[in-house]
Amino acid sequence: MKNLGKTDIDDGEYILVKGVDFGSGASSIDASCSSLLFGGRIEIRLDTPDGWKAGEIDVPNTKFKYETLTTALTRCNGVHDVYFVFRSTSMQKRNLFNFDWWEAKKSSVGNK
């Protein structure tokens, strides 16, 4: 999903994307993020903000330049509501990072 444009993310906030169809399975996810100080973490959770954690993306200090970050996904198939839950990894709790877009990637095993 392009152009989310979520800025000034605080610890514990989340974004809900309803009805994402992962088909027979997604193996990884890309996310475009930027941070100026400590960054943080994005938890990819299914169906509720504290549901199954399908993956986790660490967002480092990118010197405020957007970077594409990738992580593996587990047990991520079918249709789900997806929660991107934002967490602090330092004493900083406000304005952790910016989140521009995300894209799930299907497994390439057996595909041509």
Annotate each language-model stretch with its function.
Residues 1-112:
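Extracytoplasmic
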